[in-house]
Amino acid sequence: MEKNTLKISLLKKIVIWAQILLQIAFPLLVLPAHASSGPGATETDMSDASTLSASLASSAAQNGADAMKNTATHLATTHAASTVEEWLSHFGTAQVTLDVDDNGNWDNSAFDFLAPLYDNKKSVLFTQLGIRAPDGRTTGNIGLGVRTFYVRDWMFGGNVFCDDDFTGENRRIGFGAEAWTNYLKLSANTYIGTSQWHNSGDFDNYNEKPADGYDVRAEGYLPSFPQLGAKLMYEQYYGDNVGLFDKDHLQSNPSAVTVGLNYTPVPLITAGIDYKRGQDSMDEMKFSLNFHYALDSSWQSQISPEQVATRRSLAGSRYDLVDRNNEIILQYKKKATSKAVRI
């Protein structure tokens, strides 16, 4: 028994560290030593400054101090509005997910937000934030990632996340890799718990902590009918008494395959259905409704059916959310009982 346990533990470590190394190296393989940057911003600033100076000088010569003041106020207001609009246009994506399972539970509903921190033609550095409450556990997610576009018609990226179950005091880190092209997304994620065994809020006389694991995902769309999409995912977690499906059905080293279909009539709304099948004939079905708002796009474009095809392109999915499991999967262990010694 001990030999089998050691073999499983060794295999688990090999798989997890192989995933981490691949995910760290993935975007670096296509990342050049230096990113090119143009002088466009400097030239624009100089042009704006010249326009402002010329307008003020003209007003001062023709109408005096009051007119110059009004002109300066108008130009400053216009410039401020332009700056705010440009700043907002570089914000990425906000998504509200309404998720109901086959038991009528809405616990997996969530809010996620991605914002670029640095953005140019060939790369984007971004942060992603999220909040959700699966099984009544308020969980926050914060991540940092990079996406590169140096290979024609492909995006290669990597990310790191910190997940925190504020209610149950469980924490973990995650590493991810992405490879996207037009109408196709591939990704892989590794999850590693950082908190140790502690009192469980789900069971009396039990301890709990995050289970280590990984998943591999693929999502694709039909070029001839981009509103329809399909996805496939394989996931594996390690440990005894792991709640991959829920806390009432615990399994040892569980794995599962998920298949799903989704329909996007307009870029703003996506409806989906997922079916997950695991060991011991465990399965579940989930229905989801996502409201996906791109802050860099107009309202008209987000309710236009013609814009769905653009969303499926590599350029249109530049600020899409990272595809990962933001819910912390837990494992449980019964507390050791101490026997009283009679003298």
Label each PLM-derived region with a short phrase.
Residues 1-11:
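N-terminal secretory signal peptides that target proteins for export/translocation
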Residues 90-92, 105-111, 135-142, 154, ...:
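Residues that define the transmembrane beta-barrel architecture of outer-membrane proteins
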Residues 118-126, 151-158, 183-188, 225-232, ...:
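Repeated loop/turn-to-beta-strand initiation elements of outer-membrane beta-barrel proteins
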Residues 60-165:
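Outer membrane beta-barrel translocator domains of Type V secretion systems
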Residues 111-115, 142-146, 160, 175-181, ...:
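Residues on the lipid-exposed face of transmembrane beta-strands in outer-membrane beta-barrel proteins
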Residues 39-88, 194-231, 237-249, 264-270, ...:
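Flexible, glycine-rich linker and terminal segments associated
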Residues 24-32:
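C-terminal segment of classical bacterial N-terminal signal peptides
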Residues 98-104, 131-137, 146-148, 162-166, ...:
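Transmembrane beta-strands of outer-membrane beta-barrel pores
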